[in-house]
UniProtKB/Swiss-Prot annotation:
InterPro entries: NADH-Q_OxRdtase_suN/2 (IPR010096), ND/Mrp_TM (IPR001750), Ndh2_N (IPR045693). One of its GO terms (molecular function) is quinone binding. One of its GO terms (biological process) is photosynthesis, light reaction. One of its GO terms (cellular component) is chloroplast thylakoid membrane. It is found in: Plastid, Chloroplast thylakoid membrane. NDH is composed of at least 16 different subunits, 5 of which are encoded in the nucleus. It comes from Mesostigma viride. It catalyses: a plastoquinone + NADH + (n+1) H(+)(in) = a plastoquinol + NAD(+) + n H(+)(out); a plastoquinone + NADPH + (n+1) H(+)(in) = a plastoquinol + NADP(+) + n H(+)(out). Its EC number is 7.1.1.-. Keywords: Chloroplast, Membrane, NAD, NADP, Plastid, Plastoquinone, Quinone, Thylakoid, Translocase, Transmembrane, Transmembrane helix, Transport. NDH shuttles electrons from NAD(P)H:plastoquinone, via FMN and iron-sulfur (Fe-S) centers, to quinones in the photosynthetic chain and possibly in a chloroplast respiratory chain. The immediate electron acceptor for the enzyme in this species is believed to be plastoquinone. Couples the redox reaction to proton translocation, and thus conserves the redox energy in a proton gradient. This is NAD(P)H-quinone oxidoreductase subunit 2, chloroplastic. Signal peptide: none annotated. The lineage of its organism: Eukaryota, Viridiplantae, Streptophyta, Mesostigmatophyceae, Mesostigmatales.
Amino acid sequence: MEFKDLIASLNIDAVLPEAIIICSSLFILIIDLIFQRRANAVLPYMAILGLILSMLSLLFQWNGKEVTAFLGSFQTDSLSIAFRLLIALSSMLCVLLSIEYLENSKKTLSEFLVIFLTATLGAMLLCGSNDILMIFLSLETLGLCSYILTGYMKKDIRSNEASIKYLLIGAASSSILLYGFSLLYGLSHGHIEIHEIAANLIKDQNGNSLASLVALALIIVGISFKIAAAPFHQWAPDVYEGAPTPVVAFLSVSSKAAGLMLATRIMTILFPYIINEWHNIFQILAILSMAIGNIIAISQTNIKRMLGYSSIAQAGFLLVGLLAGNINGYSSMLVYMLIYLFMNLGAFACVILFSLKTGSDQIRDYGGLYLKDPILALCLSICLLSLGGIPPFGGFFGKLYLFWAGWEAGSYLLVFVGLLTSVISIFYYIKIIKMMIIKESPEVSFAIKNYSQKRWSIKDITPIEVSILICVIGTTISGIFVNPIISIAQQTVIDSSWLMAI
């Protein structure tokens, strides 16, 4: 085969979105080396431009066709494109809300952006990975960058502690996942492409063997860590509290999106003959996540830690869609992931803005915020109400579609637990909203008494305020136009032939 034929067979254009992100990272490094601190003002917008171009290239690829690239190690299909688009969008919003945060902390901007874009690259590659080697390399790219970003505030003890905990638990989960992959590699006689592994398991009647069950258990442990599903959630509260808030916002969405896409691809292709076993395991994980996340969140006094436990519960809700195992199930998972992106990033953006003004992440310090900054209080309230599943915001319709898909699939216990824990979650979200709107002077926090009066204007709008407004609009609009969003999600699932073949 000639060199040009080999290059053509690789289908390099399938990874154009990821190539754009790589070029953006290199360009940021070069500009920073040449102009140094003088370029700090434009570097974030170069990253945003790269992410926008990456999203545009993904939209052009979203045509219902499936393309296999790099000799089978990467596959683009409608579902993977949708998840990659969600990751790129969340990264763009996180860059917007990190600009003021990093300027305030006096940390190097270029290094942060390059590591951040590399983490985004790992998450996007993970969504399209089609062999176990590519999966592991993508997972480690995301993981290693996440550990570095978590400890980016080197002089902050909490950031260092969170980074060490995340590194140790992450390394353990990666080794467990790798051992599961090694079992599949042996059972399939040395194949790494997941469709070939599945074919060999069927051929040798190893699909439901003891070794396959052990591999399944190990892989589920590794994936559950990435999506912060209980009882593999121990890292999440500490990391959410100690890590830089823009990093936490990124991990809360991108890590979940990549992990869910990986779980969908691996479980449906590799383990169709032991579907009852992995359904039962994930059902237990979903119930534990919804219960533990929402119950423990009630007692939290730090808002970032509270959102950490909320994120654990959200992982449980998303697993309801995976377990439904049909068009409505997978599409409801995708719809809720989109809505979760807006409402969760919106909440974190509000937390960052409040923290920059007051230096506090304590829930009690939000008392009376409405008196000094009514727009911020309103935006945070909308995001929290949506997270709690209160109509008419997107979170309500996203949960409704998830639970309907679960009920239709016969997951009655999951739906019951989901509804019950959703009611519990409303309590701690409403508690914060109630504190923000109090007007009695004794109950207004000290932080708010010293809070400078804020008047939002288009003329003086900051990047973090732009991020907040985008998220609030997205949260509201997704509730109004939920039917078209559901239709697009359903068509996305239908166009993914590997999913429909199950």
